[in-house]
Amino acid sequence: MALKFHVIHQSKKSRARVGRIETDHGIIDTPAFVPVATNGALKGVVDHSNIPLMFCNTYHLLVHPGTESIAAMGGLHKFINRDAPIITDSGGFQIFSLAYGSVAEEIKSHGKKKGSSSILEITDEGVWFKSYRDGHKLFLSPEVSVQAQKDLGADIIIPLDELLPFHSDQQYFLSSCSRTYVWEKRSLDYHRNDPRHQSMYGVIHGGIDPEQRKIGCQFVEDHPFDGFAIGGSLGRNLNEMVPVVDITTSHLSKDRPVHLLGIGDLPSIQATVKFGIDSFDSSYPTKAARHGLILSSQGPIKIANQAYANDLSPIDPKCTCLTCSSNLSRAYLRHLFKVHEPNAGIWASIHNLHHMQEVMKNIRKQILNDEI
């Protein structure tokens, strides 16, 4: 079945809301944090059964082992042994981000194009690009992208779109927005010919231009998408992103879930959940964990700092995750990082992911109490 979305409580203080998304593979309480499992695995974490919704990257799975191979094995849920909801992207984000470089402060599309681009050609039909593994020439069109996501069998899928860097000129920016909506319509048509149990979110582009964001909202509202996803360039920093998210959500109807693509650090969640965002995806918690940044109820902990060398206190006294329940001290975890013990990143990742789930649980509670 396609997803069902219910608003359980609308805050009296803001546009924030508590909701529930029902899929064939389970229920997602919203607002929700969605960790990114790039290759079908959360880095540093083996057990993902307590993660309500997990984000997998079509591009990487298309390159290896191949989406047709995964389909032959029964789909992504069976392949990675997960009996809970999965969302996949179109593959476009990875293709364009590999070409245009890294992102800053989790705000997408701010960077300069690399000298050696993985993109060979962008046409109205799709994009030709080189595999990051072996340089093999590949083609991704709306239909190819959706078929790949059909092969994977994710519960929520995303239409193909073009991700532009922040510094694109106005003429190309406008033509890219137009091409993206043509691609999304083709993606939706292909999906609706064979919907299966899957749902598709329409992606809203428009950069930081309020009028273009309004046009993007009108496009997704006019088509039978099952949910909305805010994508494209969101500015160069948090201060630029907040008004973009505010004005975008103000143009959306309230009957469908809203996802903020690629944004999931704590400051961004806290700044935008009040606008009615229902889910956030990011690799931030596991990436931070691998670099020794521990998220805690007492604030972020840079565990490698000398201050923790003899600190036998628990990592987070209020946390009940496996790491904290194992009574690991801050001094011991610091030691593991200092000697480059692989377990360090594992313990930290387990904790950070649990912390994010607790943060979202608390946010839902605050919304129910009309505190957000």
UniProtKB/Swiss-Prot annotation:
Residue numbers binding substrate: D89, S90, G91, G92, F93, D161, G232
Active site: D89, D281
Cofactor binding note from Swiss-Prot or TrEMBL: Binds 1 zinc ion per subunit.
EC numbers: 2.4.2.29
Pfam families assigned: TGT
Pathway in which this enzyme or protein is active: tRNA modification; tRNA-queuosine biosynthesis
InterPro entries reported for this sequence: TGT, TGT-like_sf, tRNA_ribo_trans-like
Annotated segments matching region RNA binding: 262-268, 286-290
Cofactor dependence: Zn(2+)
Group of enzyme by EC: transferase
Organism superkingdom: Bacteria
Protein's job: Catalyzes the base-exchange of a guanine (G) residue with the queuine precursor 7-aminomethyl-7-deazaguanine (PreQ1) at position 34 (anticodon wobble position) in tRNAs with GU(N) anticodons (tRNA-Asp, -Asn, -His and -Tyr). Catalysis occurs through a double-displacement mechanism. The nucleophile active site attacks the C1' of nucleotide 34 to detach the guanine base from the RNA, forming a covalent enzyme-RNA intermediate. The proton acceptor active site deprotonates the incoming PreQ1, allowing a nucleophilic attack on the C1' of the ribose to form the product.
Stated family: Belongs to the queuine tRNA-ribosyltransferase family.
Subunit structure, as described in the record: Homodimer. Within each dimer, one monomer is responsible for RNA recognition and catalysis, while the other monomer binds to the replacement base PreQ1.
HAMAP family, alphabetized: Q_tRNA_Tgt
Protein name per its UniProtKB record: Queuine tRNA-ribosyltransferase
Naturally occurring in which organism (per UniProt): Chlamydia felis (strain Fe/C-56) (Chlamydophila felis)
